[in-house]
Amino acid sequence: MLRQILSQAKKHPSLIPLFVFIGTGASGATLYLLRLALFNPDVCWDRNNPEPWNKLGPNDQYKFYSVNVDYSKLKKERPDF
Amino acid sequence: LTNTSISDAQEMETIWTILPAIILILIALPSLRILYLTDEINDPSFTIKSIGHQWYWTYEYTDYGGLIFNSYMLPPLFLEPGDLRLLDVDNRVVLPVEAPVRMMITSQDVLHSWTVPSLGLKTDAIPGRLNQTTFTATRPGVYYGQCSEICGANHSFMPIVLELIP
């Protein structure tokens, strides 16, 4: 199968960049969707633990990319309970 | 007479596949960075809670002392000349300009949405969930908005008024 793909790629080399970009885009979209499904605090898969969003840590980063704010270094301004 | 085996100008084809792709990536990456920047916490001066009810808003200023009040639309009979029908309320949300404000928005009963279009704000008020939006208004004045999620008979009659004072 892989050999077939490689031989066809050699016959039409100008199509290789096309497949590279389309492949990167599609796999990036799928991986991000999986990341959201598994790590987003709004999502819950476990019937026995229905509210995992109540156990978020104040120093964890849940965003994909944080530009200026370093969540692990945030200082704690609220009182302990 | 089909074109399945016609293959011409392959170098050109490669270039005009790769070049637009690179241009689009160069546009997309800073754009995504800006998108994530809009989500940042901007160290707000204070926090206001906005709770949607059917069919009014409750605002709580609890940072320094406890100020809690309801904000109902002014009924047409109570309007003074010069007031805006369906937009003016009895108690406005008073805020200072140039101060980053954090709004925590939720609802007591059904879905509502807290909107002030002239400040670019729209956040849904969802029962059981706390949504956050932050903003910094730079110009004093009165800013109007209306509830933006259908919530029953008086959905059109629960406006939001922000009064920004210098």
From Swiss-Prot, chain A:
Protein name, please? Cytochrome c oxidase subunit NDUFA4
PTM Phosphoserine: at which residues?
Answer: S66
Location within or outside the cell? Mitochondrion inner membrane
Residue stretches spanning the membrane: 15-37
| Coiled coil spans | none
Query: According to Swiss-Prot or TrEMBL, what is its membrane topology?
Result: Single-pass membrane protein
Which proteins does it associate with, and in what oligomeric form? Component of the cytochrome c oxidase (complex IV, CIV), a multisubunit enzyme composed of 14 subunits. The complex is composed of a catalytic core of 3 subunits MT-CO1, MT-CO2 and MT-CO3, encoded in the mitochondrial DNA, and 11 supernumerary subunits COX4I, COX5A, COX5B, COX6A, COX6B, COX6C, COX7A, COX7B, COX7C, COX8 and NDUFA4, which are encoded in the nuclear genome.
- This protein's GO CC annotations: mitochondrial inner membrane; respiratory chain complex IV
Q: Which residues carry this modification: N6-acetyllysine?
A: K10
Pfam families found in the cross-reference section: B12D
Mitochondrial matrix compartment residues: 1-14
Q: Which residues lie on this side of the membrane: Mitochondrial intermembrane?
A: 38-81
Which family would the database say this protein is a member of?
Belongs to the complex IV NDUFA4 subunit family.
Q: Which UniProt keywords apply?
A: Acetylation, Electron transport, Membrane, Mitochondrion, Mitochondrion inner membrane, Phosphoprotein, Respiratory chain, Transmembrane, Transmembrane helix, Transport
Its annotated function is as follows: Component of the cytochrome c oxidase, the last enzyme in the mitochondrial electron transport chain which drives oxidative phosphorylation. The respiratory chain contains 3 multisubunit complexes succinate dehydrogenase (complex II, CII), ubiquinol-cytochrome c oxidoreductase (cytochrome b-c1 complex, complex III, CIII) and cytochrome c oxidase (complex IV, CIV), that cooperate to transfer electrons derived from NADH and succinate to molecular oxygen, creating an electrochemical gradient over the inner membrane that drives transmembrane transport and the ATP synthase.
